[in-house]
Amino acid sequence: MSKNVFKFFGSLALFAFVLSGTVVKAGTKEDVAKKGSVSCGVSQGVPGFSNADASGKWSGIDVDMCRAVAAAVLGDANKVKYQPLSAKDRFEVLKSGQIDMLSRNTTWTLSRDAGLGLEFVGTNFYDGQGFIVRKAAKVNTAKKLNNVKVCVETGTTTELNLRDYFKANKLKYEAVSFTKADEAVAAYDAGRCDVYTTDKSGLAAQRTKMKNPGEHTVLPETISKEPLGPVVRGNDQNWKDIAAWSLYVMIEAEELGVSSKNIDSMKSTDNPNIKRLLGLEGDTGKSLGLSNTWAYNIIKQVGNYGEVYEKNVGAKTPLGLARNGSPNQLWSKGGILYAPPVR
């Protein structure tokens, strides 16, 4: 075979390789390691989920998800740069590469998962949409919300669920839309709307910002399923795995009774499941491209799922969301939280 033929087939193979889009390049994990921080898209301020205090320090369930990934990859949960995003802009900012992950009380749906080139990595909070009204209105059920003005944030499943619910129940309403949740809440609080709607956890969070929280009540109906969780780009399987298993580790740790407070004393255990979780046996970090202390770092620095929940949204917080009896309890205690085996 002539040299020209070899050159032809060699060029053809290279051309096909380039067209396939499989050109080797650094992944998100490598980018994060190089810059020394995780860029995380969060909300513009939802207490209990992602909210900055007066000093600029961020906290919340979604914030702790970002911190868990940073602990896994960089060994330091504090190496996170937060970027507040509107519901409308969040997906485009993630797709463009401006952030490494999105952890912003975002609902997992078919169209988002399959149609945006993005991947939901799991559910860190199971929620459902509801309504908040003034007690003075003396409305005790959403079925009586007819001919009302409803404040709502654009670019959300909330808008779609609102439309479906009122149509299905033959009720009339006028949507008053805003690009920021805080604007929608402020408008409702100022009396521009009769109702404000979002996920029920969000209603509890936003009520704490109102002038007189005690004057408002959340109606009993839950009109949708809202599995909320972090999102990454769909072209990096390793990064998706890291984000997913960072969540699973927190759930698994709680089930095994391992917390940020007792984790070091657990090193002397004979339980093989705990030994693997803490990196004392096996090589669970290898397949993720991480050190074998990746899970230990998450639990030690961020906590198990129960710790994260109670600290941010639990019964003793301003949100007061009791965990028992909710889907956000471990499967062994009546909830639906379940982590695949860490082995």
Q: Residue locations for each model-derived region?
A:
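Acidic, polar ligand-binding/catalytic clefts
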Residues: 67, 71, 75, 79-144, ...
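Bacterial N-terminal signal peptides that target proteins for export
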Residues: 1-12
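Bilobed "Venus flytrap"/periplasmic-binding protein-like clamshell domains
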Residues: 39-48, 58-73, 107, 127-183
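Short helix-initiation/N-cap motifs at beta->coil->alpha
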Residues: 80-92, 175-190
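C-terminal functional modules
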Residues: 280-343
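Extracytoplasmic small-molecule ligand-binding "clamshell" domains
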Residues: 26-27, 33-103, 288-290, 301, ...
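Extended ligand-binding regions for polar small-molecule ligands
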Residues: 64-67, 71-73, 136-139, 143, ...
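Sec/Tat signal peptide C-region and signal peptidase I cleavage site
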Residues: 19-26
